[in-house]
Amino acid sequence: KMIKLFKTTNILVLLICLIIFTLSFLSFTLLINDGVKTDKISGNVIGSTDVKEVVPNKSEVKVLDDAYFKYVNVSMLDVDFKNLKRQNSDTKGWVKVNGTNVNYPFVKANDNEYYLKHSFDKSSNKKGWVFLDYRNDIDNLSDNTIIYAHGLVNNAMFGSLRNTTKEKWYKNKDNHIIKIATENKTMLFLVFSSYTIEPESYYITDNIESDAERLNFYDILKKRSVYDYGVNLSSKDKILTLSSCYDNTKRMVLHAKLIAVK
């Protein structure tokens, strides 16, 4: 009886191991397939969109900070959104970060969950897409406007944001400008902080009630940075936050303030 029980137990253990292996293999295969689909969708979206970078006429630019004059010859994005809106009516803008692979249209849903598991074409995909916080209006900026995406290991989506914590990236001031375009305007944001942190909700606070609290909020975000960008902030500034997962346990965060609008 003991021998029979031993054999039965071994068979059960073997079956359990086989089931676990099969499920793990299927899960891994699905993730690989999602990655391939994401690369294909990204290629199609970027390839079918007319995205230009144009140095604007200075008289057309509303300068919000004197720091802009250090970047006065920096180009601004000019994007044809017609085709993007036809592909996905949730499209709200385009974001580009120099020195990274971040150069994508971003979307917005009614929550911050949908585009974590859906691609630009709204197909189910665990790699997700780049999306604006549902609380934000990109054409009527909150104190803090937040854009999210997964940090993929192949540097797709926001995976390459990890570059911003490396000396090679932050010592090159040409990388410090984030470009945003919408159907109605194009904007330049100047980076003032980059860091990794344990998951929290503080840095994605969208609006702050008083000037004093807002200035304190900005100061805390600035002090977290791995590098001192030498950027001054006032309580009147509007900031942009790019947020992504980092090594499965942390968040990769990049903050910048609005310095020019066209």
Where are the language model's segments positioned?
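Accessible peptide chain termini
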Residues: 1-2, 95
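N-terminal Sec-pathway targeting helices
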Residues: 2-19
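Solvent-exposed, non-transmembrane regions of membrane-associated and secreted proteins
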Residues: 24-262
